[in-house]
Amino acid sequence: MEQLQKRKIYDTTASNASTGILNGKSSNVLNWDDVRFSWAYPLYKNMLANFWTPFEINMSHDAKQFPTLTETEQEAFKKIIGLLAFLDSVQTDYSMRAAEYLTDSSLAALMSVLSFQEVVHNQSYSYVLSSLVPKATQDEIFEYWKHDDVLKERNEFIIDGYEKFVDNPTPKTFLESIVYDVILEGLNFYSGFAFFYNLARNQKMVSTSTMINYINRDEQLHVYLFTNIFKELLVEFPELNTEETKTFVKTTLMKAADLEKDWFRYIIGDKIPGINPEDMETYISFIANKRAVQLGMEKPYPEIKHNPMKWIRAYEDVNSGKSDFFEQKSRQYAKVSADNGFDEL
């Protein structure tokens, strides 16, 4: 299959609107009133509307509360933060590499916003940890991914998929790398998100959970971007719209769900009150189905039709317009005058 060519800095012979997502022609001048995809500009506006920084969230209450968590809750908290930090670090790099081959300036611009948001997510984990634990513990948490065997297996599954594209950039490997991206942003975070939301509904670590919700909100838009690109590529490269691709998506999502369930059993299992292991595993399958539908593919678990963890919907519904479900003043946080709000300790 043809190799992908990186986007030119500019091309005076091409129109502003691109002729293709990959290996197309475009001037590379971005005019939002002259772009190929009608969904690109509304998505750009939504991504900008989500703008936030960790500094807006006061961590002083969480800092007081963290030592009162059970040992199991503290251990899960730290390991899940360590996982999220790894995933968002990798995601920042992958999105920038993928953007180099996008020959549509509007999609490249969206990818730039996405990459920036991933940097903010990653920094938010440092912000949380610096509020709660000593520097030495923080450093240890950021090394978990190197030494934890369960975590390594889970991470290597994603990285292997990304590296196939990086080492051999073709339309096929690019398309397949999107599936791994959707898994990373749209599946691998979700048992971890559920842990923090479960703490929040028990009035524990509310500020951290609010930050997680902001990240959740961003990731939903990131998944929307990548699934749209995936479906557009199947139109642009009909030779990739095959049974082989459908099988690849299904088997890859199922393998990812199995690894996610293994991680959940290892890190949470039946050790955290309020999280039912059977419900969580069904929930992971439910989310895998949701991502398959967004990719325009068949559900890998057709027998799973409903979300068994109905309580979590309030935490994931980031556009409901309801008052802050964490019972904080509002989601428009006043700026904290001292780092992490420690002037209030």
UniProtKB/Swiss-Prot annotation:
Its EC number is 1.17.4.1. The keyword Oxidoreductase applies. Fe cation 2 binds at E118, E185, E219, H222. Signal peptide: none annotated. Binds 2 iron ions per subunit. Transmembrane segments: none annotated. Fe cation 1 binds at D88, E118, H121. GO terms for biological process: deoxyribonucleotide biosynthetic process. Keywords: Deoxyribonucleotide synthesis, Iron, Metal-binding, Oxidoreductase. The active site is at Y125. Its cofactor is Fe cation. Gene3D superfamilies: Ribonucleotide Reductase, subunit A. It comes from the Bacteria. It is an enzyme of class 1 (oxidoreductase). CDD domains: RNRR2. PANTHER family: RIBONUCLEOSIDE-DIPHOSPHATE REDUCTASE SMALL CHAIN, RIBONUCLEOSIDE-DIPHOSPHATE REDUCTASE SUBUNIT M2. Provides the precursors necessary for DNA synthesis. Catalyzes the biosynthesis of deoxyribonucleotides from the corresponding ribonucleotides. Belongs to the ribonucleoside diphosphate reductase small chain family. This is Ribonucleoside-diphosphate reductase subunit beta. It comes from Halalkalibacterium halodurans (strain ATCC BAA-125 / DSM 18197 / FERM 7344 / JCM 9153 / C-125) (Bacillus halodurans). The gene is nrdB.
